[in-house]
A protein has these predicted regions:
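Aspartate-rich (DDxxD/NDxxD/DxxxD) Mg2+/diphosphate-binding motifs
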Residues: 1-14, 22
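Histidine-centered, transition-metal-coordinating active-site segments
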Residues: 19, 23-223
Length: 223
């Protein structure tokens, strides 16, 4: 889903019902790939896709591993994005968390992946060492306080929501502008679901490019 959880919320608003990116990912591999035939993935792989987020702990080890790996990835990439956006510096991260988890983007990811592998191998249970898991949870809380609720980050989220919602309304009004291979799907799934599938499959850059192409007059420079 473009723009991550901001995009997820934007699609939920226009659809009038919850949109979950993990359920959409499962829909892609089960129903949309290979012209509707799906990829015929194993149960364990499908549960890894479906269970990487949400309140329920996945019942398979594959799902449990993906769930922790997803959190490792998004927290550290969000830190990297926040640093590049000037919202945060590496030194702003509490010292005791850096002492446990590492002092750099690469260092944290390497440490957490190794800790996940070693702890799971030693205990037979998928997870991080308790002190490391506690530090990860505290780092996540720190990110909510300093980054996710930051006015600069929220303003970018508002822009992302506006882009996706305008794209949605445009394609609902102009279904003939959808890529040709999406059009037959409307006969089976309806226009709303088809437009949602198309937008949900966009990257951030592609969504921005589509918005610029459809709504920004040619020759105007947007800064």
């Amino acid at each position: 889903t473009p723009f991550g959880h901001a995009g997820e919320r934007a699609l939920s608003e226009v659809l009038g019902k919850p949109f979950y990116h993990n359920e959409q990912s499962l829909r892609v591999v089960d129903l949309l790939e290979k012209d509707g035939d799906g990829l015929n993935l194993t149960y364990e792989t499908r549960m890894g896709i479906l269970g990487h987020t949400g309140p329920r702990i996945p019942e398979t080890q594959e799902g449990q591993i993906v769930r922790i790996a997803d959190r490792i990835a998004y927290i550290n990439h969000d830190i990297d994005d926040a640093i590049r956006a000037g919202i945060l510096t590496e030194e702003d991260i509490p010292r005791h968390l850096r002492a446990v988890l590492g002092h750099s983007h690469k260092g944290r990811i390497n440490f957490l992946v190794e800790n996940l592998i070693c702890t799971t191998s030693d205990t037979g249970l998928v997870g991080l060492e308790p002190p490391v898991a506690d530090a990860m949870n505290e780092l996540r809380s720190f990110m909510f306080e300093r980054v996710y609720c930051n006015p600069v980050a929220k303003s970018q989220e508002d822009k992302a929501r506006a882009i996706l919602q305008q794209l949605y309304h445009y394609y609902m009004a102009h279904p003939d502008r959808l890529p040709e291979h999406f059009r037959p799907q409307m006969d089976f799934d309806g226009m709303e679901r088809t437009v949602c599938d198309y937008i949900a499959g966009m990257t951030d850059k592609y969504a921005i490019d589509q918005f610029s192409e459809l709504f920004i007059p040619q020759g105007w420079q947007v800064r």
